Amino acid sequence: MGQFNQTEKGSFEIKVALAEMLKGGVIMDVTNSEQAKIAEDAGAVAVMALERIPSDIRVQGGIARMSNPELIQKIQETVSIPVMAKCRIGHFVEAQILESLQVDFIDESEVLTPADEENHIDKHIFKVPFVCGCRDLGEALRRIGEGAAMIRTKGEAGTGNVVEAVRHMRAINREIRHLMLMDSSELMAEAKRLGAPFHLVQMVAKSGVLPVPNFAAGGIATPADAALMMQLGAQSVFVGSGIFKSEDPAKRARAIVGATTFFQNPEKLAQFSMDLLDAMKGIDIRQLKREDLMAQRGW
């Protein structure tokens, strides 16, 4: 079972505080209890329980849904670190089920097939904290406005290609800098342009940061990828297919954890990158059809 007690969850501030506890770490996708144990032993701060990692979803196709509750429970029984699980965008009943299972975080994820193409879940009505993906500042603030306690880049999951995660993180950073240069009288118009709640736009313009932790996800496959995202401003990283689609998952998991911790130390990063077997082959994003892009799901 994960370490966060359900009775400790509830208010938005508490949800954000729980997300803050995961800063500086790695959250790993796992599909069974054996992988969950490998992740925990490697130093992961949390695991994401799912039946198919994103690269398999791409290959196998079909409708990707919430994981089987039995799988989630087996993983909860195996590890002591927090256990997250994904629900489909807009599928609040899947979220209700996951909350009843006492998962530690719910990821309303574009990796799964959206259940609602117009509406995301009202996350404020849940006690369990949510994490959501974004491509830019407007999308981040819309999800936070709905109650997301943690934001991550969408990247392009299941590709082993970090280019989209870099694009999304840079977009967020650039738009925050732009916001900070604005006069207060310009912020309402900017909120309209971003499609974001005005009070959150005001908050970011004043503080220069998102009001919730900002993590990186999507295409991270190597220790260098993890360090790159941390140097760009991510506060933690999610790694999906990059670990268990590699030829040496346990060693690569440890290396990515180390690189996330020592992301500003090139000598250590070189050490973490040595003696690894081949990373996942990966996909050139330019070769994907528009309908195969997961990051475009949601709004």
From Swiss-Prot:
Keywords: Lyase, Pyridoxal phosphate, Schiff base
PROSITE patterns documented for this protein: PDXS_SNZ_1 (PS01235), PDXS_SNZ_2 (PS51129)
Catalytic reaction annotation: aldehydo-D-ribose 5-phosphate + D-glyceraldehyde 3-phosphate + L-glutamine = pyridoxal 5'-phosphate + L-glutamate + phosphate + 3 H2O + H(+)
Pfam families listed in its UniProt record: SOR_SNZ
GO BP, one annotated term: pyridoxal phosphate biosynthetic process
Binding site for D-ribose 5-phosphate: D29, G158, G219, G240, S241
Active site, per annotation: K86
Binding site for D-glyceraldehyde 3-phosphate: R170
Matches recorded under Gene3D superfamilies: Aldolase class I (3.20.20.70)
Pathway: Cofactor biosynthesis; pyridoxal 5'-phosphate biosynthesis
Signal peptide location: none
GO molecular function, one term: pyridoxal 5'-phosphate synthase (glutamine hydrolysing) activity
EC numbers: 4.3.3.6
HAMAP family: PdxS
Family: Belongs to the PdxS/SNZ family.
Assembly with partners or alone: In the presence of PdxT, forms a dodecamer of heterodimers.
Physiological role: Catalyzes the formation of pyridoxal 5'-phosphate from ribose 5-phosphate (RBP), glyceraldehyde 3-phosphate (G3P) and ammonia. The ammonia is provided by the PdxT subunit. Can also use ribulose 5-phosphate and dihydroxyacetone phosphate as substrates, resulting from enzyme-catalyzed isomerization of RBP and G3P, respectively.
Protein name (Swiss-Prot/TrEMBL): Pyridoxal 5'-phosphate synthase subunit PdxS
The encoding gene: pdxS
